[in-house]
Each structure stands twice: as structure tokens, then as C-alpha cells.
């Protein structure tokens, strides 16, 4: 039984935030906006920010029983392991509101209900997620469709995204596509370096649909948000080095976590001239440590014009004055079109039908896959290090420049588990050594503070230890397997399809990726 539905437990529901391109969120009413709407939206977003600032000082945010949550973005493939543009039919077959459409017609998302971390929760979650995904696969697979958890579908090729039908049916997605290209005024060049460099011109935001991630949510008190966000930024590099799972895009071997660069380039609203001027990209690591969640929302408004200036009827000042919790839809919608790897979230948690404001930190660093046990090991490592680092009396971010944290993130995206990362008091160190010598003990201590049972800590952090010792994650396994198949005479497309077939078999077996044979 799920913790949030146990007898006598309060009924907990998030009001789904209209978030990034890949999230369904709330549908919009139009695909184009005039100048008056944009001016009115700018004023409304600022008004929402003013109300939010007041709430931070005067309102009681729900944080007594911090909850964690998870979203897993998945791909759909046919019997030949090629992209299946069939999410509408698949979702009808699954018939479970926990599964939603994503940007691409070959994508779906699984939303895991929020729950507390202590005790055996993560072990229970492993069983629940596996059961749900297996049931979804049975229902979706009547026509041979398979659900795949992976950072980028390796069999995805340009021709799949160059014809009609790649996008899910949604006014919201069409509006975002139009807004991004209106801002740019030209096609988006996709230029990615690596062992097999890629150059391609995108006439739509279709390449973004290739990027499927696992998103981790943590409910945080307002006074603790800055420390948690700073710690998450520090951990983004090590996190990504361990979890990289996207070495191929359009048949090219590129970065260990190519998803990072594909996402950044495919949603870039800046033409070349604005890049040269130093205009900030919407996919953004950030540029400084923060002292309040308000810093991030102020940056959103200061640096980024609206993409979807959709106005609501809510008067946030009147709502707050009446003692109700304002939804602040304009602030949230705008926040959802600034693509931070660690995103602040304002939301309203409904407890037994009563709305309570709360804040979440949404970690968007990791790719989906390879297995449920690997993803939960990644989440345990993240939640553990986050707890310990955010509570340190001498915070690590006071000993480390923000630029160094960003450099670690990019090095991890490029080189994965073979990356060398900068760490205070250690200088430049191999990512695997940093995990084994420094970060695993921190993660154990953090999970202990969360009240996570010892056997749970040992199971999931043991997976992280095994991965670091073996030097193998999803990206290294994919590359090694494709290389072996090509050495046996397979073409690249055939090798990618066969690799994906084996990947799916291992995924369902739920053995950690570092134990998989090539």
C-alpha cells in the first residue's frame, strides 16, 4: 500500500504545475499573443512576485512533514526498437492518470505520488514503481509497443523528427514551438562536439523531445531553500557523472550525457548575435550562489521574456487578503519556461481538500534509466548528500566558486564517470574516486538523518559504490556494447537497435547497470 494512501493518512495532492516544454501542465488557450497581452502578462508576473515575497515573510508554508516525489520520462518503441509515435493510444490503453503525455508522440511520463523518505519508503517505492511500469507495459504492449527508460533513445534518427506526427496533440506544445521560433527568427542549429561530431538544423523544437529525464522533487521550508539549492548545484557534477545514460543522438556518439547539450541547444531562443552579446540562455545552470528562493524568481523576471503570456482571472492580492492561498499561475508558468537544472517550485499542496502553500526543489539533472534500482540508487545518493551538505556548518559552497560547480557539471556531461572534477581540499579528482572516498560517507550520513533504515541505505548506496568501483554506468555500457557489435560486423543502425534490445531485457531484469554483460 502506498504511504500516501494508508488508512487514516491525509489525502495529499499537488496541484500540477505548468512546467517545462515536456510537461503537460495546464493547456493554454491560444498559440499566438499580441503586444497588449505581453505587457499585461509582464505586469501580472511582477504582481505575483510581490505577493510571493509577502507570503515568504507572513504565510505558513507546509514543511512539517517533507515529502519527496519523482517523475520518470519514458520512450515508446515498436517491435523493431524504432520510435513509436503512439502515446495517445498507449495512454488510452494504460488508463492510469499517473501516466501523462510528453512533448514527443513517442514519449510518456510516469508521476510517482509524493511520500516521506524515512524508514523503508525507498524499498517500498522500488516495488511500487516496478509493479506500475510492468502493468503499463502489459497494457501498452498489445501491439508490440515497448516502454523504455533511457536518456536519449539511441535509435532515434533525423527522419523521425522531420515529418509530421512527431509532436503530441497539445495547444501548449504548439504555442511553445511558435514562441521559441518567433523569438529566434530562424532555425536552430544543433552543433555538438564529441567523438563523432553532429551538425543539424532544427526547424522545430523536436530535438528537445529526445531528452527524457528522471526528475526528483523535495519539499523544502522557505528558510532552508537556499542551502538546499546551493548544495544541489554543487552535487550536479558528481550526480551526472554517476548517472550518465545518453551517449548517442541521431546515430552519433557524442557526450556521455548528450541530453544536456541537446536540451540546451534545442530550446535556445537566442540567435547568434544575442549569444555574442552575452544574453543568458533559457536552459541555465545559473551564475551565483543564492541566499533566498526569491533570488531565483527575481532572476526569472529580470532576464527572461515570457514565452507563454497566458493570463488567468486570479487576483493574487485579493486571494491573499481573503485568507486564501493564491495559485500564482503567471509566476509559475513563467518559472516553467526557464529551464534550470535545479528548479525552484512554488505549489499548493491540498491536504484533505485544504490548500497549503509549499516550496519544492526540482532536480532535473539525471536521465531516465537504466533500471528502477539504478534510478532509486541515484535518488538515494542525491537525497543523502543534499541533506548532509545543506546542513553543514561550514557549507561547501563557501569553499568553492560557482564557476567550478558549473565546470564540473559540463565535464560530467561530456565525460561521465571518467570525468575529473574539482573539489575543495582535493583539487582535481576522478569522479569515481570522489564518490568512493568523499561523497558516499556523506550520503550515508544524510540518509541516516532522514531516518532511512540501514538496510535501505546499504542496498541503494551499495549500487552507487559498485558503479563507481566498476567505472560503468548506462553511457559506458551502451558505448561498449555498440562497439562490440560493430566489431562483429553490424552497421551502426543495426548495432544501436540490437543494443537497445539487450538494454530493454536488462532493464526489466532490474539488475544494476554495472553488472550487465556487454
Question: What are these model-predicted stretches?
Answer:
Residues 8-518:
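Phosphate/nucleotide-binding catalytic core
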Residues 2-5:
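Extreme N-terminal basic, low-complexity initiation segments
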Amino acid at each position: 500500500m502506498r504511504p500516501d494512501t494508508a488508512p487514516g493518512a491525509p489525502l495529499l495532492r499537488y496541484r500540477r504545475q505548468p512546467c517545462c516544454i515536456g510537461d503537460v501542465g495546464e493547456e493554454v488557450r491560444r498559440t499566438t499573443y499580441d503586444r497588449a497581452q505581453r505587457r499585461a502578462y509582464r505586469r501580472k508576473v511582477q504582481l505575483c512576485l510581490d505577493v510571493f515575497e509577502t507570503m515568504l515573510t507572513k504565510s505558513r508554508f507546509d514543511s512539517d512533514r517533507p515529502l519527496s516525489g519523482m517523475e520518470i520520462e519514458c520512450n515508446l518503441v515498436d517491435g523493431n526498437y524504432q520510435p513509436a509515435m503512439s502515446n495517445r493510444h498507449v495512454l488510452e490503453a494504460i488508463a492510469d492518470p499517473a501516466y501523462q503525455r510528453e512533448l514527443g508522440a513517442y514519449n510518456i511520463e510516469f508521476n510517482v505520488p509524493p511520500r516521506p523518505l524515512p524508514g523503508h519508503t525507498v524499498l517500498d517505492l522500488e516495488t511500487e514503481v516496478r509493479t506500475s511500469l510492468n502493468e503499463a507495459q502489459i497494457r501498452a504492449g498489445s501491439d508490440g509497443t515497448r516502454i523504455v527508460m533511457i536518456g536519449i533513445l539511441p535509435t532515434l534518427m533525423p527522419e523521425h523528427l522531420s515529418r509530421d506526427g512527431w509532436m503530441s496533440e497539445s495547444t501548449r506544445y504548439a504555442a511553445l514551438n511558435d514562441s521559441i521560433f518567433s523569438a529566434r527568427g530562424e532555425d536552430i542549429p544543433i552543433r555538438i562536439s564529441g567523438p563523432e561530431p553532429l551538425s543539424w538544423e532544427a526547424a522545430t523544437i523536436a530535438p528537445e523531445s529526445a531528452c527524457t529525464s528522471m526528475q526528483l522533487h523535495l519539499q523544502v521550508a522557505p528558510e532552508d531553500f537556499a542551502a538546499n539549492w546551493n548544495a544541489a548545484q554543487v552535487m550536479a557534477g558528481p550526480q551526472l557523472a554517476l548517472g550518465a545514460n545518453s551517449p548517442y543522438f541521431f546515430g552519433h556518439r557524442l557526450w556521455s550525457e548528450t541530453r544536456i547539450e541537446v536540451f540546451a541547444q534545442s530550446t535556445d531562443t537566442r540567435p547568434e548575435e544575442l549569444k555574442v552579446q552575452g544574453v543568458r540562455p533559457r536552459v541555465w545552470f545559473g551564475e551565483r550562489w543564492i541566499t533566498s528562493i526569491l533570488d531565483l524568481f527575481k532572476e526569472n523576471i529580470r532576464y527572461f521574456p515570457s514565452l507563454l503570456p497566458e493570463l488567468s482571472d486570479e487576483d493574487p492580492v485579493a486571494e491573499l487578503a481573503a485568507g486564501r492561498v493564491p495559485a500564482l499561475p503567471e509566476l509559475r508558468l513563467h518559472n516553467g519556461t526557464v529551464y534550470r537544472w535545479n528548479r525552484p517550485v512554488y505549489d499548493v499542496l491540498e491536504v484533505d481538500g485544504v490548500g497549503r502553500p509549499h516550496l519544492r526543489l526540482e532536480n532535473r539533472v539525471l536521465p531516465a534509466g537504466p533500471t528502477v534500482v539504478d534510478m532509486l540508487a541515484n535518488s538515494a545518493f542525491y537525497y543523502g548528500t543534499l541533506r548532509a551538505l545543506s546542513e553543514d556548518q561550514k557549507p561547501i559552497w563557501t569553499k568553492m566558486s560557482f564557476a567550478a560547480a558549473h565546470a564540473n557539471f559540463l565535464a560530467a556531461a561530456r565525460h561521465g564517470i571518467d570525468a575529473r572534477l574539482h573539489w575543495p581540499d582535493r583539487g582535481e579528482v576522478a569522479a569515481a574516486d570522489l564518490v568512493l572516498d568523499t561523497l558516499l560517507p556523506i550520503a550515508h550520513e544524510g540518509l541516516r538523518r532522514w531516518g532511512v533504515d540501514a538496510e535501505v541505505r546499504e542496498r541503494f548506496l551499495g549500487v552507487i559504490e559498485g558503479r563507481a568501483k566498476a567505472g560503468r554506468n548506462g553511457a559506458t555500457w551502451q558505448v561498449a556494447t555498440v562497439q562490440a557489435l560493430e566489431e562483429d560486423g553490424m552497421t551502426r543502425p543495426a548495432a544501436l537497435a540490437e543494443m537497445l534490445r539487450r538494454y530493454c531485457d536488462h532493464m526489466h531484469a532490474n539488475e544494476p547497470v554495472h553488472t550487465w554483460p556487454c
